[in-house]
């Protein structure tokens, strides 16, 4: 996808952008996995998209933007900017960018979208597509969160999701499929955040792609997310 932003750019981000533009997502939820988890082959699940927006921090480290959902919402955990696809959205990229604009005031023109990765199917049959974009000019972004949806906006180093630090896990099960739910603790100033479950899983996958190495712990993801076994993810 062509770059929309001009001027001097971080070479680290340029290199990452070029590499990610070549990424080809593997096949997602296969028919056998659908049948195993009670999802009809002809099902047309609801669709959503999230934005993995990457920028370079002051120390030269990659950072990804996250939000703490408003306490007014039924789910007020940490999440990536994003939401459900609307009728007027042309594609998943537009959904992710529109939602990021609405939720945190991120101007779509600031984001260079480079790729999408394999979709995830939630247990509620919602297909979630992670869209990866580069924010070359971090100074041009002044977060203006929608108070009805977002309590705060913060950023973390994606590499933390490959490390066995400030992490714990709990075994969960759904329809006979046992898997691990991962919890990552992060401190930003005086605020503490817990990144877990679905959001953590997406960020583990993103970090694996970015740094081209597996996490330092057993991931054991649920099969129903996208039908790709852990042993095969390591080959991608």
Placement of each model-derived feature along the sequence:
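N-terminal leader/linker segments that precede catalytic domains of diphosphate-processing enzymes
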Residues: 1-80, 84-142, 159, 174-236
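Non-catalytic RNA-recognition surface used by pseudouridine synthases
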Residues: 169, 173
């Amino acid at each position: 996808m062509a770059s929309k932003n001009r001027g001097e750019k971080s070479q680290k981000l340029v290199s990452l952008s070029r590499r990610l533009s070549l990424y080809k997502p593997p096949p997602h939820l296969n028919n056998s996995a659908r049948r195993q988890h009670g999802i009809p082959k002809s099902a047309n699940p609801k669709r959503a998209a999230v934005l993995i927006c990457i920028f370079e921090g002051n120390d030269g480290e990659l950072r990804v933007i996250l939000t703490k959902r408003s306490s007014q919402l039924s789910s007020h955990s940490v999440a990536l900017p994003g939401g459900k696809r609307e009728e007027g959205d042309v594609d998943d990229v537009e959904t992710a960018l529109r939602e990021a604009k609405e939720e945190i005031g991120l101007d779509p023109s600031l984001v260079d979208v480079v790729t999408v990765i394999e979709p995830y199917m939630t247990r509620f049959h919602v297909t979630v597509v992670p869209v990866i974009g580069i924010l070359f000019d971090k100074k041009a972004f002044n977060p203006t969160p929608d108070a009805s949806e977002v309590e705060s906006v913060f950023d973390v180093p994606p590499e933390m999701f490959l490390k066995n630090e400030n992490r714990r896990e709990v075994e969960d099960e759904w329809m006979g499929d046992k898997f691990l739910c991962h919890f990552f603790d992060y401190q930003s100033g005086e605020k503490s955040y817990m990144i877990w479950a679905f959001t953590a899983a997406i960020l583990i996958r993103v970090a694996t792609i970015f740094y081209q190495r597996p996490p330092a712990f057993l991931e054991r993801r649920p099969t129903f997310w996208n039908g790709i076994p852990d042993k095969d993810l390591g080959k991608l």
